[in-house]
Amino acid sequence: LRLSLFQVSVGMAVVLLNGTLNRVMIVELEVPTWLVALMVALPLTFAPFRALIGFRSDTHRSVLGWRRVPYIWMGTLLQFGGFAIMPFALLVLSGDTHGPAWIGHAGAALAFLLVGAGLHTTQTAGLALATDLAPEHSRPRVVAFLYVMSLVGMVGSALAFGALLENF
């Protein structure tokens, strides 16, 4: 159950990226829809690297002797880095600054890219760790449970973000 919490965080990040920031950028900041769609699609560019991340976490041991956990840490740090850059990129996109607009677009694109890389890295290494720890006869149930927890994270965070942002 504790190992499934990374899937909840992945679900929350997906809702934050695809739902909340999408609406904020289009409605409040009046960023062109095609540009927002491109930024929302940026995290998917890291999807093909999941096989490489999985292979690397299968074969490479870190300095501490761990295989999966450093990838989960790195993915979490990438997610955090992207979400840390995002508010500043949105401030520049709002037009209340003296800098050129392309800096805000580049910052938002970088933030979306970092979050996407973190999502895929965390999810791939976490699923691999769960299958390593689970007995062979229960692996399908463990993977199914992890995906259910991802959906729980998506639904729960959508309800929470919706309630918190109701006045906006």
Regions found by a protein language model. Give the residues of each.
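Membrane-embedded alpha-helical bundles of multi-pass transporters/translocases
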Residues: 1-168
